[in-house]
Amino acid sequence: ASQIEEKISTLLENHIRYDNKLIMVFNHLTDDDIHEFINAFIKVYSDSTSFEGTEYTADSCHQVTEDLILYNFKIVREVSERKELTMSDLGNLAEDVLGQYSRIIGYRPVKITCFDALAIDIKNKRLILQLDLGSIVLANAVDKFFQNLRVSINKAFRKLGVTNCRVPEKAQFLNLYTTLQNFYDNEEGEVTKASFSTSKNNHHETLRDRARDIRKAEYHLRGKAAEEALGGKIRPYRISKRFERITNTWPQVYTGVHYRYFNKAISGAKSLYEAHIFDIKSYDDYIFIIDKILVNRTVT
């Protein structure tokens, strides 16, 4: 029984640390940078007032392995909860309303405690910024939440007199835009969901029937052949892909942009800095899926 409890505890701990996160990756830390960040966070976690004036508190620090240090920051975030309303929800209005509509959907604000984080990957010299519960963060709030986390950490550094390190600006993090096409083109792994553009219109596909990879499904292959016959190609602007790390362990990554941005004729390189990682059950899954994201970048 104690072994089972220990396994459950480990799974829960790993879920809180690594799973369902929106991440940004800064890949250019030096040994000096790492040393300075570690010393700065020692000051932050030694002073209970370090995050005063922000929405965050310094929650916990974990030396997960000799290669990874995880700094957690607690914040209470308001999200919208979707609910199908019942007769009891509608009260006296139920009979009239439900007589006109088969389903009534409502949204209400819910406060959720989140544990955002900054991770220092010592071995790979990376700084990883991550938002908790990535699946419930609305797309139009992602930039705002990452900016709030970055600014709050840097404000804590300044408050404590730390002058030699700062969390970088967003534009200094790795641009993941080219992973969109590469996740589709590279054979490794399985594509589980995709939104893509063709010469005629946009399509949104998910796994159905017994398909494990959209790209190998008959319904997708027919459309792909028709597009290629016209001289075009499948161009994804949102994509989810899973990779088998070990037998029956499939960490996943989702990344994408809004179609209007994808299709907009703008000069210069386009940018995408965030990826959503999920089905992460361990530290090894976490490092593995980040490596898969980075290896699928085309550096231009």
Describe the function of each predicted region:
Residues 1-300:
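Intrinsically disordered, low-complexity, charge-rich terminal extensions
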